């Protein structure tokens, strides 16, 4: 997936697409692990669905925030620094690194898919509550960040944004 995104970034001359696909990559990993595990379990399905909700929310937000704004300043700086070597460097430094990080960060989802016929249980319910809390905090944080940077709170001083 990351190599395909890298090729698209070369065509578009915009490495920022890697950010938009960060969350969606987890969706792909979650469902691939679900399919590969061949485990028909409640837990596996719930993990894949929750990963999908989180990944689509994150990818959608990043698309909405960045769409039409051109390449992110970080990648522009890399492009300027590496010059003609940027294409190959971006494969490893940007796309390869994010692919490796995605694999590591998604290990709990991948490992959670490995048990056949796993029921949700009390620990699973606690996990769903923790997930929902995190999902809510991320969503509210994104809305607050946007309000501070572009909306009603733009004139207030919020150094963390």
Predicted regions and their residues:
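Membrane-anchoring alpha-helices and their flanking helix-loop junctions
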Residues: 1-159
């Amino acid at each position: 997936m990351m190599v395909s995104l890298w090729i698209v970034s070369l065509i578009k001359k915009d490495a920022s697409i890697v950010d938009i696909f960060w969350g969606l990559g987890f969706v792909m990993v979650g469902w691939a692990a679900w399919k590969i595990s061949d485990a028909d379990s409640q837990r596996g399905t719930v993990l894949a669905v929750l990963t999908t909700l989180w990944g689509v929310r994150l990818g959608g937000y990043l698309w909405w925030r960045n769409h039409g704004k051109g390449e992110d300043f970080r990648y522009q700086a890399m492009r300027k620094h590496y010059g003609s070597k940027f294409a190959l460097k971006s494969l490893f430094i940007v796309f390869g690194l994010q692919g490796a990080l995605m694999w590591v960060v998604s290990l709990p989802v991948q490992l959670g898919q490995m048990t056949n016929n796993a029921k949700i249980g009390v620990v699973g319910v606690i996990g769903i509550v923790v997930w929902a809390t995190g999902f809510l905090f991320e969503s509210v944080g994104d809305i607050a960040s946007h309000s501070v940077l572009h909306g009603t709170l733009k004139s207030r001083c919020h150094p963390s944004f």
